[in-house]
Amino acid sequence: MKTITLLIPVYNEESVLPQLFKRLDEFTKNTPNYQFEFLFINDGSTDKSFSIIAEQSKKDSRISYINLSRNFGKEIAMIAGIDHVKSDALVIIDADLQDPPELIQEMISYWEDGYDDIYARRNNRQGETWLKKKTSQWYYRILQKSTNIPIQVDTGDFRLLDRRCIEALQKFRESQRNTKAIFSWIGYKKKEIFYDRDPRLAGQTKWNYRKLLNLAIDGITSFTTAPLRMATIFGFIVSFIAFVWIVYLLVRPLFGVSTGAGYSSLMAVILFLGGVQLLSLGVIGEYVGRIFIETKNRPLYLIEEYHAGNIKKTRR
């Protein structure tokens, strides 16, 4: 019997966990031909999420859990789980039930047809503001334009991955991660399915615009040098315009045209060039900072407690 692990990152989800357990149990009862493991990654929750998971694991032998030593963020929590997956396939799903577990049956069907990465694309994003929807769309399209990788648009982490995709993901050890882009980078045979994303069942979203901005910066700087190239091109254009302007100022007196004091225009040019320089330094600093962090070679995460359920491990 093939084994499938459901990887579920958790951060302060105590209000939704009981309903999640129920939905997962109903799903597995309707999918009897596979052996399932529910691998919960507690990412430093400050509520009762971990104690609820630990208690439920005593009742359900399919539940495994990793309790991280602190909050490392969802990207790191996912790789912590991926590192411990031994099953034939992996499904990544959020704990908030916005992604319906029932859709996994369709993913499994395509997996049996030979697809390696079956990802769910959202028809709609209920419960999200217009601004969040638009900024997400812009981000994916900018990332697509600035890389030579076919980025999957309007998708999250909800997907099924074959064993060889799991082993490929385990090789990525960078600390500044954008897993959604990594899914695209590894390639393999992909299949897109569409679904309507539900609003949160309970609790509040853990994402805010600051976290989304950081994720966007990580994604762009991890997979493309386009910002550096743009800074170079912009610097060349500004330098060329400045050169033409200088030539113009030198030629004007030859035709009897007074140059005038020009303090206002001079200050405007100085401030503009100063802003361009600071922006360029900021872009360079982002890349240098990431190089500095990666060269430290620190562990991506630390585990406080690991509990393995009774699922039969088919890989080593």
What are these regions (language model features)?
Residues E26, N30, E55, K59, ...:
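Conserved amphipathic alpha-helical interaction elements at protein-protein interfaces in regulatory
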Residues P9, L68-R70, R159, T232, ...:
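Short conserved micro-motifs on helix faces and helix-strand junctions that flank
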